């Protein structure tokens, strides 16, 4: 991830934690140290996904990050809700009208275009 991606993710985490009282936000960059081995990082992320009730997937970029795509599919297969966040104005889907790859888009309960819209959708699901 780029420094800008990491900073954006940290901003999203802080935004949600400041506004949602009963929510604990898992942030992948805090779950396992970067110095950890591949298996350790994978297992830590898998544990966090299994413990989570709701997922926010950052979908910006010309293509959804490979790891994010895997996590969205895994989470969706467990019957849990994924809320996408795509602030990128570019379209990355291969189908007309799709914002991202159709498998990702259809796995998301919703895709928000701003933090405020994401917060509103989360509040409706949680409270």
Predicted features and spans:
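Conserved catalytic or regulatory cores that recognize and/or transform ribose-phosphate-containing ligands
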Residues: 1-127
């Amino acid at each position: 991830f780029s420094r800008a991606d990491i900073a954006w993710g940290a901003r999203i985490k802080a935004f949600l934690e400041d506004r949602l009282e009963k929510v604990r936000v898992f942030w992948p960059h805090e779950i396992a140290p970067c110095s950890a081995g591949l298996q350790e990082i994978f297992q830590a992320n898998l544990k966090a996904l299994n413990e989570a009730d709701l997922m926010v997937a950052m979908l910006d970029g010309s293509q959804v990050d490979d790891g994010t795509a895997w996590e969205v599919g895994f989470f969706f297969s467990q019957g849990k809700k994924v809320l996408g966040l795509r602030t990128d104005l570019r379209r990355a889907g291969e189908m007309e009208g799709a914002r991202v790859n159709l498998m990702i888009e259809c796995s998301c309960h919703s895709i928000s275009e701003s933090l405020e819209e994401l917060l509103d959708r989360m509040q409706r699901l949680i409270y």
